[in-house]
Amino acid sequence: MSNLTFFFDQLLSYSYLQQALTAAILVGIICGVIGCFIILRGMALMGDAISHAVLPGVVIAYMIGASFFIGAVITGVITALAIGYVSQNSRVKEDSAIGILFTAAFALGIVLITGMRGTGVDLWHILFGNVLAVSRTDLWVTLGIGLFVLLIIILFYRPLLLSTFDPVMAQATGIPVQMIHYLLMLLLSLVTVAALQTVGIVLVVAMLITPGATAYLLTNRLPVMLCLAAMFGVISAIAGIYFSVIYDVASGASIVLVASTLFALAFFFSPKQGVLTRYWRGKRAKEMSATS
């Protein structure tokens, strides 16, 4: 039996694997789409900060029996506001404020997790993910978050577009640029929550940035970039789950490695931006000029 046949046999036989694959695909789509705006706005570090800063909110939500995604959203928004406040009211620049606050929040989350070791509750899967343990409830939550995020992006596409490429012009036309920024932070927090079970907090930034960065190397048009990023997210999810099942390795890490491989291929072989493509094009141009 070939590996591919074995994978499909397992997929058709076990519902948990079907749920895992569906959840991973959903996460790949929404991470790819929201990641495009993060990349174009130069907010990769902010994306890293928010994805790590939600950890204490998730742990506290577990501790008090509340919904973990509410805790994550609250913590993510508070962190975004705190970063803006510190950078605007001190000599500390935004990148420094991000580094200070997100590491502090992440450290608090680690302390809270280790403090719960004697309670019988294991929250370490939040850090590294375990997509094969996704329940039907988790799947519905992920689907709900995904639909909400995509709906908001569709409804606010024009303000997001203008504030991303020309915030001064957007402000002049009456678009509340600051509110759009915090809306994006809210969506980022939601996407992080959706990705917790799949790749975990440690690796979620890779899924936020890598598919979008890969698409960015292949096109200059935002609609095409959004579609390509979503497609790369889906490919990474499917291939990552496949390698996880076949070779019995961590699913989250497998998904991220596939996404990184796709980026490497685009980096070297992209028709316009690829390093090797530009080298070959330049070499061919020199040969043609030498023979003419």
From Swiss-Prot:
Residue stretches in coiled coil: none
Predominant location: membrane
Cross-referenced InterPro entries: ABC_BtuC-like, ABC_TroCD
Keyword terms, alphabetized: Cell membrane, Ion transport, Membrane, Transmembrane, Transmembrane helix, Transport
Family annotation (SUPFAM superfamilies): ABC transporter involved in vitamin B12 uptake, BtuC (SSF81345)
Cellular component per GO, a single term: ATP-binding cassette (ABC) transporter complex
Localization in the cell: Cell membrane
Residues passing through the membrane, by range: 20-40, 58-78, 96-116, 137-157, 168-188, 190-210, 226-246, 249-269
GO terms of biological process kind: monoatomic ion transport; response to zinc ion; transmembrane transport
Membrane topology listed for this record: Multi-pass membrane protein
Function: This protein is probably a component of a manganese permease, a binding protein-dependent, ATP-driven transport system.
Family: Belongs to the ABC-3 integral membrane protein family.
Protein name: Manganese transport system membrane protein MntC
